């Protein structure tokens, strides 16, 4: 039975090298990259921009230049930054290598992983059980899950039927969260803005036609931590 396993989010906490500092948007433009700069930053970083790859696709999102006073409660320095692979780049053949090569090329100093999402996409369980029916039985308390006692469920209530579409385990503050949901429905609901996911399903043999999809379900493990604790 075909499966498709991918990274869906890869973000690291790093430091810029003293030799290249400041590694702002102009630094990358001067090195021949196309850069898309956001007019505003984040709560922690005052600068945020996206660097394109050699094919003209968004590749790495950079957040840098900690806001004044942010170091006092986050342990950041003026060299601190976050690097995140954009979602499309996560579905490349070797996203970890791509991130590592980018960091080495520009002398970033790796500190730790900030967030990593691993996803497992499938149509049926190995036993042949239908995921939607399994989820319904779980919510009806026919099964119990060990650990991660915090549970959130989402369903679709219509005149014709009521279907459970997702269940999440773990508190929002947990280092590890688990979610099982209908990925096909999510893609359709968001306007099919991520064709690379359907392409990954096709290339792995999970689906026969990326334009005519069955219900593909996803089990996703999201691991994250503050920059100081992981």
Regions found by a protein language model. Name each.
Residues 1-230:
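Structured, helix-rich domain cores that form ligand/interaction pockets
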């Amino acid at each position: 039975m075909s499966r498709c396993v991918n990274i869906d989010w890869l973000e690291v906490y790093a430091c810029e090298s003293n030799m290249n500092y400041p590694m702002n948007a102009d630094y990358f433009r001067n090195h021949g990259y196309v850069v898309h700069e956001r007019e505003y930053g984040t709560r922690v970083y005052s600068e945020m921009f996206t660097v394109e790859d050699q094919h003209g696709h968004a590749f790495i999102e950079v957040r840098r230049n900690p806001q004044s006073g942010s170091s006092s409660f986050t342990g950041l320095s003026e060299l601190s930054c976050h690097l995140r692979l954009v979602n499309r780049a996560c579905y490349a053949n070797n996203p970890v290598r791509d991130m590592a090569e980018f960091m080495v090329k520009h002398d970033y100093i790796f500190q730790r992983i900030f967030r990593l999402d691993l996803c497992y996409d499938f149509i049926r369980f190995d036993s042949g059980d239908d995921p939607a029916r399994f989820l319904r039985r779980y919510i009806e308390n026919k099964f119990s899950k060990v650990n991660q006692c915090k549970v959130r469920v989402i369903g679709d209530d219509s005149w014709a039927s009521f279907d459970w579409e997702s269940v999440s385990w773990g508190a929002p503050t947990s280092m590890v969260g688990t979610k099982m949901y209908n990925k096909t429905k999510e893609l359709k609901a968001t306007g099919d803005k991520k064709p690379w996911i359907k392409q990954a399903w096709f290339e792995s043999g999970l689906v026969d036609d990326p334009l005519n999809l069955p219900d593909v379900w996803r089990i996703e493990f999201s691991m994250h931590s503050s920059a100081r604790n992981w």
